[in-house]
Regions:
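Alpha-helical transmembrane-bundle signature of multi-pass membrane transport and export proteins
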Residues: 1-435
């Protein structure tokens, strides 16, 4: 058992990766703090679901608009420099927001403006982080590194960070929580600055004079990736489901959940933080459970049904009047969603050709984000017009219906039988990839 545990944390023996991982852990705590502080700061300013919807939509717009540029920057610049710049900008913006909050000058539009920049910073950071990790670790430790991050993200960003944010807000104020979040981003930047990694040499230019360059080259690459998606039925169906899934659940989760906690439970930031913590703990448990087992034989069907049917407890979030019942529903959604993501990541690694994997991953991220602003923008008005209970009912029932349609549309049962994945390889196992 001790050997198994050692393999799971083996990437942390590398100094540069350890610094990057510590910085990520602290920054994710800050993101969790910011998530709770943002919601309660809007409420303290007298805002409701519509105002919170405006602010969260601003964040998603910054993310969506900049994500493709972030990918280009990660390929053309030093990833270390991009990460440091993104974290420094995010920290500086939150320092300004915290100062405005603590001095009583903060307004809703300040939060919206800050959210746009926070989203843009994240759009640059994520692809740079993804591109940097393989330069820090040997290939046989990348799977374990992904497992470490997959466990860390829900525990820090969705569990510990929100819980700490709820306590800080209840004891002090949202402004103090925002200040702490700002410091976490600056700490992360300092960790990455302390790394010794050097930029890779630039790739030699192609001799083919007819090869597209600049913007034409980027368009050609994106077109090739999109052509592959259109011709790969299971992949196209999965991306279609992901787009609708985000539209149905993200707005209610990000915009309406704080008001469900306040109105149904009579709760405050502490209860809200506990519900988000339940999402995170469930997510970590789901990721660990699915990654410690062999890939399911019906991997496409299992993945899609976990996303769809696993969202049914969203109905509970709109009707529960007991904290633990709401937390249990959140934990189930978190567990099934994270487990499905582990399978999805494995499929991108094993069924997408090597020369297309980066572009397909980028398209996946972009398509997943595409309707995020729409979901955020609609959630507040829909909650005011139809009620929070009705919106959460749609968020719970809608994905169930859509996932059944997508399994049929993508011909997933026949596809997964026609393309079996080696069960002995243990692609989703965090510890068995090394010889």
């Amino acid at each position: 058992m001790s050997k198994v545990r050692w393999k799971a944390v083996r990437p942390l023996r590398h100094r540069d990766y350890r610094l990057l991982w510590i910085g990520l852990a602290v920054a994710l705590l800050g993101s969790g703090l910011w998530l709770v502080a943002l919601a309660w700061q809007v409420i303290e300013l007298g805002g409701g679901p519509v105002q919170l919807s405006v602010v969260t939509t601003a964040y998603s717009i910054g993310l969506v608009v900049c994500v493709l540029f972030g990918g280009i920057a990660a390929d053309r610049l030093s990833q270390r420099t991009v990460i440091v710049a993104a974290d420094t900008v995010r920290g500086a913006v939150l320092l300004v927001v915290a100062a405005l909050a603590l001095t009583g000058w903060l307004e809703i539009w300040h939060l919206a403006a800050g959210a746009v920049i926070i989203g843009a910073g994240e759009a640059f950071l994520i692809p740079a982080y993804t591109a940097l990790v393989p330069r820090l670790l040997p290939a046989d430790e990348l799977l374990a590194a992904n497992g470490l991050e997959g466990t860390l993200r829900p525990l820090a960003q969705q569990a510990t960070g929100p819980a700490l944010g709820g306590v800080a807000i209840a004891a002090l104020s949202p402004g103090v929580a925002i200040l702490v979040a700002a410091l976490t981003y600056l700490f992360s930047a300092a960790c990455v600055l302390a790394m010794h990694v050097r930029p890779e040499p630039a790739a030699p230019a192609k001799a083919d004079d007819d090869a597209p360059t600049g913007v034409r080259s980027m368009i050609a690459d994106l077109r090739e990736g999109w052509t592959y998606v259109r011709q790969t039925r299971w992949l196209l169906a999965s991306l279609l489901f992901g787009t609708i899934f985000v539209l149905l659940i993200l707005g209610p989760l990000e915009v309406l959940l704080p008001f469900a906690v306040r109105d149904q439970l009579g709760g405050d930031a502490r209860e809200f933080g506990l519900i988000l913590a339940a999402f995170g703990i469930g997510g970590a448990a789901g990721a660990l459970l699915i990654s410690s087992r062999k890939l399911p034989r019906r991997y496409l069907t299992v993945m899609t049904l976990m996303w769809g049917i696993g969202s049914a407890p969203f109905v509970l979030l709109g009707i529960a009047e007991d904290l633990w019942l709401m937390a249990a529903g959140a934990a189930v959604v978190g567990a099934t969603g994270s487990a499905a993501m582990v399978i999805w990541g494995t499929l991108l690694q094993r069924r997408v050709p090597d020369h297309l994997r980066g572009r397909i991953s980028s398209l996946d991220f972009f398509v997943s984000l595409l309707l995020m602003p729409v979901s955020m923008a609609l959630a507040g008005p829909a909650g005011s017009l139809f009620g929070v209970t009705a919106v959460f009912a749609v968020a719970g029932i809608g994905p169930v219906i859509v996932c059944l349609f997508v399994v049929w549309l993508g011909r997933m049962p026949s596809d997964e039988i026609a393309h079996p994945l080696d069960q002995d390889e243990g692609a989703t196992n965090l510890i068995s990839a090394e010889a």
